[in-house]
Every structure is written in structure tokens, then in C-alpha cells.
């Protein structure tokens, strides 16, 4: 039963808009949007125990805290990499009955 609950919440993460909002905010150089999205992503990852993505999103949140996007590229790439790894693993989990 606990496994089913964990799986349910993990799969719901796939529909969370935070990563896309972060991507859009950075592309538009919208520091406020990027910060809010990074902060939300960080919190969701902390709550769900997604440690690797939490760590890099927390670092990115701090870089964006001043609402400036300059200097965020390298950390964003790390967030993107961890997000891809995590979402692929969740998709595999979701495919299992």
C-alpha cells in the first residue's frame, strides 16, 4: 500500500509545471518567474524525497534569489540533467503494473 502511494505521488510529479516554468522564465530572462519556479521545484523535490534534483534546484534558487538570471546557465543545465534522469525513472515506474 505504501509503495502504491509513493508511486501515485511520483507519477503526479510528471504533471508539475515548475520545471517548464523555470525553463520559460530563464529563456525570457524573467528573473521573478524563474525564481518562483525554481523555489517551487525545490520544495516539491524536498517533499517527495527527490534528493539529487532538490540539491541542484536549491542551489539554482539561491542564484536566482536576486531575481537576476545572469550566471544561472550552468546550474540550470544540472537541474535539467537531474530532472531528465528523474522523470525517465518515474515514467519507467509508471509503466510497471
Tell me what each language-model feature is.
Residues 1-40, 71-94:
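Long, amphipathic alpha-helical coiled-coil segments characteristic
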Residues 18, 30-37, 45-65:
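Short, well-ordered alpha-helical segments
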Amino acid at each position: 500500500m505504501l509503495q502504491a502511494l509513493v508511486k501515485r505521488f511520483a507519477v503526479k510529479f510528471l504533471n508539475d509545471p515548475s520545471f517548464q516554468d523555470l525553463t520559460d522564465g530563464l529563456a525570457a530572462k524573467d528573473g521573478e518567474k524563474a525564481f518562483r519556479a525554481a523555489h517551487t521545484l525545490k520544495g516539491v523535490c524536498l517533499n517527495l524525497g527527490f534528493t539529487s534534483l532538490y540539491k541542484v534546484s536549491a542551489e539554482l534558487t539561491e542564484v536566482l534569489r536576486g531575481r537576476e538570471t545572469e550566471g544561472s546557465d550552468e546550474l540550470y543545465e544540472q537541474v535539467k540533467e537531474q530532472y531528465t534522469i528523474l522523470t525517465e525513472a518515474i515514467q519507467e515506474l509508471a509503466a510497471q503494473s
